[in-house]
Amino acid sequence: MNTTIITDVECIITKPDRHNLITVIVHTNNGTVGYGCATFQQRPLAVKTMVDEYLKPLLIGKDANNIEDLWQMMMVNAYWRNGPVINNAVSGVDMALWDIKAKQAKMPLHQLFGGKSRDAIAVYTHATSDSMEGLYESIDNYLKQGYRHIRCQLGFYGGVPEALHTTQNPTVGSYYDQDQYVENTVTMFKLLREKYGNQFHILHDVHERLFPNQAVQFAKDVEKYKPYFIEDILPPNQTEWLDNIRSQTSVSLGLGELFNNPEEWKSLIINRRIDFIRCHVSQIGGITPALKLGHLCQTFGVRIAWHCPPDMTPIGAAVNTHLNVHLHNAAIQEHVEYKENTRKVFPGASEPKNGYLYASELSGIGVEIDTEVAADFPVTYRPHEWTQSRLPDGTIHTP
């Protein structure tokens, strides 16, 4: 095989709609260009600095064909490893290298992996409203579009606060009440099953908003409504409590969007404490570790439901689809409709058809970035209030 030398590495940050999006572009001596997602929307400048100041000089002159070696080198070169900044930066490069290899092979990415194990991947989307009437309207709309898996949320994460009993002059933050959230969410499940029966699979994201003992009770309360899975019922530092949940309920659990380090998921998979792995592909370092994780999960009967939120480039979402049509144990793909500006910046962004996503058949990933259009949407940053989630007494809680 002829060498393909890396000649330049770019990091483009843009905000076409609500979220800061980060793309890495790798250039080579034969003109083949690769694109990858490196989005860590809460810290975009940190990722750009990592790529521009540290990874770029490390990579220029290297052979782009040696993806495994380059991934290992990038991960250990700083000695400290497996954090969200370095992992996303490495991911952007890693995806771009796979994109280059697939383009040079003149095949879509999933064929480079070994081909398809399914025609398309089932999709779930988000129905969210502050009222049941609004939630019904959203669900009805998605059912008409062909969705048969819908994540249902009554209000933002933590629910709709009602008459919060806060302190005098409360600290700035996003307040919620755990007891109200649990009561309202269990009622939501009940009403949805009464209205729709089994017309669609219900998913729900707890988003770590409960204490572990509350999470155990919540899982027991919603079990009879047969959710497809409950997402992030516990934070990564409290996963030992999964044994308590497993021993008391059969509710399906999806976990992993905050994971960065293999030690966070290894024992959960081997001991079958979860049903679905929810890792965010760029947060774990890209395609190279995602393939390994997917195969590990298959060995232990754990299915794949990658985290695929709107704060991810359509490049990253397309990578998820390629992984999902290839990996035999892939179950479902999260999807939120792209807005017009995002589509302009990322030509080729895909949309579901009748509740399924189909992988691009173009060579490579199939989605790129228009850097000229991206420049029209500069990144803006302000401290996020929603990640300053607080209980009524002012205690900060995992967001």
Swiss-Prot record:
GO terms for molecular function: magnesium ion binding. Mg(2+) binds at D205, E231, E257. Keywords: Magnesium, Metal-binding. The keyword Magnesium applies. It comes from Vibrio coralliilyticus (strain ATCC BAA-450 / DSM 19607 / CCUG 48437 / LMG 20984 / YB1). One of its GO terms (biological process) is amino acid catabolic process. D-arabinonate binds at H207, E257, R278, H307, E334. The keyword Metal-binding applies. This is D-galactonate dehydratase family member VIC002985. InterPro entries: D-mannonate_dehydratase-like (IPR034589), DgoD-like (IPR034593), Enolase-like_C_sf (IPR036849), Enolase-like_N (IPR029017), Enolase_C-like (IPR029065), Mandel_Rmase/mucon_lact_enz_CS (IPR018110), Mandelate_racemase_C (IPR013342), Mandelate_racemase_N_dom (IPR013341).
